[in-house]
Every structure is written in C-alpha cells, then in structure tokens.
C-alpha cells in the first residue's frame, strides 16, 4: 500500500493564494468579484432556507398523517366498541382467576413425617457467619 504525500498540496495552495491576493491588482475587478460573491451568498442562504422549508413541510405532513392514523376514526366499528366496553376486562379477570386456581391444584406439599410425629425435637438450624 502506497502512502500518500501530504506535502504535494502545499504548492497548489500557495499558487492559488497568490492568484487571489495579487498586490496592486485591479481594484474594480476585486470589487466586482466581491459583489458577485455577496449575491451568491444571498442565493445560497435562500437555497438553504428553501431546503429547510421543504424538509419541515415534509416532516410536518408525516407527523400529521401519523397522528391522524392513531385517532379512533370509526367509533361504530365492532372491534372498537368491544375494546371500549368493560366486557373483555371482566372476561380477562375470570380467565386469570381460573388459571390461578389451576396452578394451585397442580401444586402439592411434601410433608416431613418425622417432624410431624416428633414436633418437640430440636431441628438443626444454619447459623449466620457474621
């Protein structure tokens, strides 16, 4: 891989600088060039404002269409009526309670017969290591 030489740009920049900054050059040409640059900068600012305006208009349109699509447009729609009613919430509560009862039925307790038969005996405990 060949390394690029960054010093090759310096003579080009020096010659460009000498062309733009000629001592004793024509002042009227400089003034005409500067006035044209000012006019171009006004057009550049106008172009930037136009691009930003189009971008803002486009963004606003997308935002408004998104907000409009999220509104409940068809209130007579059976699905929306069902969601607004509390019937599905009551059914959900009943289903949840049934599932909880099923899970309790599936659980069972293993009983230690020695502890039940001799409750007075001392059971060993773990002591904290503090």
Swiss-Prot record:
Keywords: Cell membrane, Glycoprotein, Ion channel, Ion transport, Membrane, Phosphoprotein, Potassium, Potassium channel, Potassium transport, Transmembrane, Transmembrane helix, Transport, Voltage-gated channel. It is found in: Cell membrane; Apical cell membrane; Membrane raft. Phosphorylation inhibits the potassium current. Residues 68-130 are cytoplasmic. It is a single-pass type I membrane protein. The modification Phosphoserine is found at residue 103. This is Potassium voltage-gated channel subfamily E member 1. The lineage of its organism: Eukaryota, Metazoa, Chordata, Craniata, Vertebrata.
